[in-house]
C-alpha cells in the first residue's frame, strides 16, 4: 500500500501550534501525526503526517488548515516505519527505569529497573518525552501511595503497565482501542516477566464490561492525546478509587492548562507536572 509523509519544520512554538491544529483536525481520521526535535541546538522541530493512498487530498486539507505550501511531501518505501524510526534511538533512563531494546541489554547497570521493548507495530517505547515523564511519576506514586490495583488506559506497548508491575505485584488492567497494540502489550508483559499481573483487553474508552470487574482503580495512567484525555475526564474520575491517583500524558506544553482544567472540574487536585522535551505529565488526586 502506498505511503506518504507530509512534513514541515519550524521553531518549537510554531511547530507545536501546527501540531495542535492538525491533531485536532485529523483526530477522527486515524492518520499518525508526530512532532520531533531535529536540531537540538537551534530548537527546530519537524511535524509529520503519515498517510496512505490519499496524500493529495490530505495535503489539500493541511494547506487549508495551516497555509498553502508549508508542508512538503515524500513517498515512503513499504517498510515498517515504526521500527525504522526507532532503530537509531538510544535507551532511555527515567528515574530508576531503563527502557531498552534487546540489542542494548549490555547497557543495563546495577540498580536499573530494566524494561525491554523492541520497536514494532505499537507505539510507546519510552523514547518519547511524554512516556519518560509518566515513568518518573509512576515510580514516585507507586512507592509513596502503594496502590492495590491499576489501569493503563491506551497501553500501546504496555511500557507503563510493565513499569507498575516491576514496582508492585498488583493486578493491572491494560487496554487499547487497537487490537494489534493489545497483542504486542501482552507479548511485552510476558517478555518482561510480569504477565501474571497484567490483563490486556481491546476496549474503546470505558464501555467494555471488563471495567466492571476491575474498577475502581487506585492508580490510573493514560498516555494518549490531549483531546481524548479531556473527553474522558468524567469517566476516568468515575473509575478512580477514593484517594486514588491519575497520571496523564501525551500532552504538549501548550495543552497543559486545558487538560488540567478538565480534571479539576471533576474535583481532582493537581499534585505535580513534569516537563520533558516539550511534553508534560500531570499527576492528580
Curated annotation (Swiss-Prot):
<feature type="binding site">
    <location>
        <position position="176"/>
    </location>
    <ligand>
        <name>S-adenosyl-L-methionine</name>
    </ligand>
</feature>
<dbReference type="GO" id="GO:0005737">
    <property type="term" value="C:cytoplasm"/>
</dbReference>
<keyword id="KW-0808">Transferase</keyword>
<dbReference type="GO" id="GO:0016279">
    <property type="term" value="F:protein-lysine N-methyltransferase activity"/>
</dbReference>
<keyword id="KW-0963">Cytoplasm</keyword>
<feature type="binding site">
    <location>
        <position position="154"/>
    </location>
    <ligand>
        <name>S-adenosyl-L-methionine</name>
    </ligand>
</feature>
<dbReference type="Pfam" id="PF06325">
    <property type="entry name" value="PrmA"/>
</dbReference>
<dbReference type="InterPro" id="IPR004498">
    <property type="entry name" value="Ribosomal_PrmA_MeTrfase"/>
</dbReference>
<feature type="binding site">
    <location>
        <position position="131"/>
    </location>
    <ligand>
        <name>S-adenosyl-L-methionine</name>
    </ligand>
</feature>
<keyword id="KW-0489">Methyltransferase</keyword>
<dbReference type="GO" id="GO:0032259">
    <property type="term" value="P:methylation"/>
</dbReference>
<keyword id="KW-0949">S-adenosyl-L-methionine</keyword>
<dbReference type="InterPro" id="IPR029063">
    <property type="entry name" value="SAM-dependent_MTases_sf"/>
</dbReference>
<comment type="function">
    <text>Methylates ribosomal protein L11.</text>
</comment>
<comment type="similarity">
    <text>Belongs to the methyltransferase superfamily. PrmA family.</text>
</comment>
<dbReference type="InterPro" id="IPR050078">
    <property type="entry name" value="Ribosomal_L11_MeTrfase_PrmA"/>
</dbReference>
<protein>
    <recommendedName>
        <fullName>Ribosomal protein L11 methyltransferase</fullName>
        <ecNumber>2.1.1.-</ecNumber>
    </recommendedName>
</protein>
<feature type="binding site">
    <location>
        <position position="223"/>
    </location>
    <ligand>
        <name>S-adenosyl-L-methionine</name>
    </ligand>
</feature>
